[in-house]
């Protein structure tokens, strides 16, 4: 059995400005919880599914760049689901690396 976390789809919502978006903090909280549960149970986290791009988009709010709802229209490029931008993706990757380094 492989345990996979998909922190993107369950955290999609329509923003006040009408854009389909995700809050980076919600994604991080779900990923962190996924690893904490597995660490507590002594099981192996198999992976995470993340929608991302290397582009400088503004499709998900939050992160170190502090993207706000009012910023979404600046570089909202997706034709389907909102993706983490390059900075948010790196933030998440470093968080996952930190959590993996704690695994027994």
Where are the model-predicted features located?
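Expand to "…catalyze enediolate/carbanion chemistry for C-C bond making/breaking, isomerization
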Residues: 1-104
């Amino acid at each position: 059995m492989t345990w996979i976390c998909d922190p993107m789809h369950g955290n999609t919502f329509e923003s006040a400005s009408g854009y389909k978006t995700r809050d980076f903090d919600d994604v991080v909280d779900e990923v962190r919880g996924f690893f904490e549960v597995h660490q507590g149970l002594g099981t192996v986290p198999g992976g995470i599914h993340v929608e991302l791009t290397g582009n400088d988009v503004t499709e998900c709010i939050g992160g170190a760049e502090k993207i706000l709802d009012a910023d979404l229209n600046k570089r909202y490029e997706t034709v389907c689901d909102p993706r983490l931008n390059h900075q948010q993706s790196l933030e998440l990757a470093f968080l996952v690396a930190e959590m993996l380094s704690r695994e027994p």
